């Protein structure tokens, strides 16, 4: 009898852990995603009213009843979805990811699963995701929905995780009810807004043990297989990613990195180099220092910083998802609009070296990265003080090297896999000097 039980348990385990097989549409969507290279991240919610970032409920220990007053002040009458989409498109972005529901538990869409949403609780009373979805379709921009697995508002997000412990006024509900709630909302997002690009999960890390260096054991069951299967059933092409800072789980279609180029390890919570999988990659970064609107945030990144980060992301084989935090009136800060316009001008001129490329043959550094496509390798020289470049162990067979966008040849020598390139001082660009290598395939 025991032997039979063991066999049944083993069989069940194999079934439950069966390797996820993406559909043909999903694989095509992955390729599109890798080719797209650049997207707009939008963190927007009722927290913008306070002008202190998207974590204000946690950081200021605002109680549930106190936070419930915020939606009454949220009336973004200057929100223009088409204007946002055109801003992204003119910046060279191919997709938009927007917060449908952040950690504060407030839904930015009309939901039957919870009355705590923009349509039912704000004077604005409109579904901003619906308006954005329509504008994205009109202008051929894909739309992804950010969805928080962490919730500082609901009673049934229980047991609590590591954050939000100072927020009072919540009961002790049932975890299975929370899972059902998430499934209901995800079903709405995948059925009421047309064809979407995918779901961008965040917050799983809240339930993981943390020793200051690595995430450890998880304390609850997020029912990932059930949730991921539901998403792929409703929209097989939809891409799933999760900002859990760990190796990808079965069912995920791309791997994301927060404020950290893949494998670089500049953040405490950075994903280990050993945990980088074979999925398409995406790094998200802020245009200033905050995700949600922050009135006092003056850390606006320069044109050079933003463009070089896009280039570096491509050199690491990754997309860049660049974030803005709109104001509570529905407008985006003028400084951020201007920054996106500058990126757009650069990418119109040099986008060929970014779009549809893959990681190049050299290990990326802060001074030099490479991208490649169609028999071309593009060297991006980010250090304007360099006049000579030496690349050891470069075993590609070179036909010629020229400055990208011109016919001017670049002097070089290539002996015993040691490549030396001699730059013309007059051709060095302060942001990015791009060399086009014609490679024998």
Residue ranges and their predicted role:
Residues 14-18:
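Sec/Tat signal peptide C-region and signal peptidase I cleavage site
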Residues 19-441:
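Mature catalytic domains of secreted/periplasmic carbohydrate-active enzymes
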């Amino acid at each position: 009898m025991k032997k039979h039980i063991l066999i049944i348990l083993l069989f069940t385990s194999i079934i439950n852990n069966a390797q996820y097989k993406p559909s043909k549409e999903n694989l095509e969507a992955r390729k599109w995603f890798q080719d797209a290279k650049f997207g707009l991240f939008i963190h927007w919610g009722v927290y913008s009213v306070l002008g202190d970032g998207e974590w204000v409920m946690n950081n200021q220990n605002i109680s549930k009843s106190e936070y419930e007053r915020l939606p009454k002040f949220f009336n973004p009458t200057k929100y223009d979805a088409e204007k946002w989409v055109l801003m992204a498109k003119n910046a060279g972005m191919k997709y938009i990811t927007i917060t449908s529901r952040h950690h504060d538990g407030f839904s930015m869409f009309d939901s039957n699963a919870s009355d705590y949403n923009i349509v039912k609780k704000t004077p604005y009373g409109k579904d901003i995701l619906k308006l954005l979805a329509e504008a994205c379709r009109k202008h051929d921009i894909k739309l992804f929905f950010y969805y928080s697995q962490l919730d500082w508002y609901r009673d049934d997000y229980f047991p609590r995780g590591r954050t939000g412990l100072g927020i009072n006024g919540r009961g002790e509900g049932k975890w299975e009810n929370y899972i059902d709630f998430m499934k209901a909302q995800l079903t709405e997002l995948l059925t009421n807004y047309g064809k979407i690009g995918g779901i961008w999960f965040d917050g799983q890390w809240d339930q993981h043990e943390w020793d200051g260096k690595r995430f450890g054991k998880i304390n609850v069951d997020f029912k990932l297989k059930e949730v991921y299967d539901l998403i792929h059933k409703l929209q097989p092409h939809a891409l799933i990613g999760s900002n859990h800072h760990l190796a990808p789980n079965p069912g995920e279609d791309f791997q994301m990195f927060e404020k950290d180029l893949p494998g670089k390890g500049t953040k405490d919570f950075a994903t280990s180099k050993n945990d980088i999988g074979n999925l398409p990659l995406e790094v998200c970064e802020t245009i200033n220092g905050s995700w949600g609107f922050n009135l006092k945030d003056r850390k606006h990144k320069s044109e050079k910083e933003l463009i070089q980060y896009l280039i570096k992301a491509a050199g690491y084989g990754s997309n860049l998802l660049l974030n803005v935090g709109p104001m509570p009136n529905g407008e985006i800060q003028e400084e951020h609009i201007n920054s996106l316009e500058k990126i757009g001008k650069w990418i119109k001129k040099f986008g060929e070296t970014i779009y549809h490329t893959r990681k190049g043959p050299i290990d990326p550094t802060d001074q030099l990265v490479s991208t490649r496509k169609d028999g071309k390798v593009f060297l991006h020289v980010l250090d304007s003080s360099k006049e000579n470049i030496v690349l050891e162990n470069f075993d590609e067979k070179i036909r010629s090297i020229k400055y990208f966008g011109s016919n001017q040849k670049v002097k070089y020598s290539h002996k015993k896999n040691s490549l030396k390139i001699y730059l013309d001082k007059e051709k060095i660009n302060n942001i990015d000097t791009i060399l086009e290598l014609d490679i024998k395939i």
